[in-house]
Swiss-Prot record:
Lineage of origin: Bacteria, Pseudomonadati, Pseudomonadota, Gammaproteobacteria, Alteromonadales
The protein's name: Small ribosomal subunit protein uS14
InterPro entries named in the record: Ribosomal_uS14, Ribosomal_uS14_bac/plastid, Ribosomal_uS14_CS
GO molecular function: rRNA binding; structural constituent of ribosome
Annotated organism of origin: Pseudoalteromonas atlantica (strain T6c / ATCC BAA-1087)
Entry GO terms, CC: cytoplasm; small ribosomal subunit
Keyword annotations from UniProtKB, A to Z: Ribonucleoprotein, Ribosomal protein, RNA-binding, rRNA-binding
HAMAP family in the cross-refs: Ribosomal_uS14_1
Cross-referenced Pfam families: Ribosomal_S14 (PF00253)
GO BP terms: translation
PROSITE patterns reported for this sequence: RIBOSOMAL_S14 (PS00527)
Organism superkingdom: Bacteria
Subunit architecture: Part of the 30S ribosomal subunit. Contacts proteins S3 and S10.
Length: 101
């Protein structure tokens, strides 16, 4: 189980990403726009640097909904491999069954 503080930190990051997503996208569009002047681009770079670090999407880490485990995470289910296996063995995941060949 991950510490509660780690789970809370990820929730905080998710809120920051949502809050600054449009502003970050606008600044990145200005920076990558070929028709923008060098001064506009430079201003956009400086403004982008002023945004909080945790507002970047890449700072977020996928975590298991149950345990908060960051590794072995399966996006399709939102669970770690361990908790997914436990749920599948109990028959709680529709359409998922143990492989045998």
């Amino acid at each position: 189980m991950a510490k509660e503080s780690m789970k809370a930190r990820e929730v905080k990051r998710a809120k920051l990403v949502a809050k600054f997503a449009t502003k970050r996208a606008e600044l990145k569009a200005t920076i990558s726009n070929v028709n923008s002047s060098d001064e506009e681009r430079w201003d956009a770079v400086l403004k982008l640097q002023q945004l909080p670090r945790d507002s970047a999407r890449t700072r977020q880490q996928n975590r298991c909904r149950i345990t908060g485990r960051p590794h072995g995470f399966l996006r399709k289910f939102g669970l770690s491999r361990i908790k997914l296996r436990e749920a599948a063995m109990r028959g709680e995941v529709p359409g998922l069954k143990k492989a045998s060949w």
